[in-house]
Amino acid sequence: MGKSTFLQDFKAFAMKGNVVDMAVGVIIGGAFGKIVSSVVADIIMPPLGLLIGGVNFTDLKWVMKAAEYGADGKETAAAVTLNYGNFLQATFDFLIIAFSIFLFIKLITKLTQKKAEAPAAPPAPPAPTKEEILLTEIRDLLKEKQ
């Protein structure tokens, strides 16, 4: 019986609205991140690289130690580089994603504020009390006698 209780507890937890909403958000966020990365890498960075001299940002690096080659021309030791271009690319990705999320949250906040500011429908009249119902019945009976 302990296992079924554990499974029931897990099912109740997993099916809560917040957990499901969060899972959907993570999946959509992952897809959105790929789209933004493509926009940055394929649309924004090439013109920016062209403006600064035809440089591809992902190729930017500082060579701390050059590669070593043997007498036969084969590389014997790889170069040691600090690839700051990849960091710049990731930074631009982050800034655009953060800005997009900011705009989305701002839009949602504005929409919820407008919804909250909308005039509420007038409240329904309260149900008649027992006394009012009794008085109505008495009135109707008196009308029938006349």
Curated annotation (Swiss-Prot):
The keyword Hydrolase does not apply. It is a multi-pass membrane protein. InterPro entries: Mechanosensitive_channel_CS, MS_channel, MSC/AndL, MscL_channel. GO terms for cellular component: plasma membrane. The keyword Transmembrane helix applies. Its main location: membrane. It is found in: Cell inner membrane. The chain crosses the membrane at residues 12-32, 88-108. SUPFAM superfamilies: Gated mechanosensitive channel (SSF81330). Disulfide bonds: none annotated. Gene3D superfamilies: Large-conductance mechanosensitive channel, MscL, domain 1 (1.10.1200.120). Keywords: Cell inner membrane, Cell membrane, Ion channel, Ion transport, Membrane, Transmembrane, Transmembrane helix, Transport. Homopentamer. Belongs to the MscL family. Channel that opens in response to stretch forces in the membrane lipid bilayer. May participate in the regulation of osmotic pressure changes within the cell. This is Large-conductance mechanosensitive channel. It comes from Bacteroides fragilis (strain ATCC 25285 / DSM 2151 / CCUG 4856 / JCM 11019 / LMG 10263 / NCTC 9343 / Onslow / VPI 2553 / EN-2). The lineage of its organism: Bacteria, Pseudomonadati, Bacteroidota, Bacteroidia, Bacteroidales.
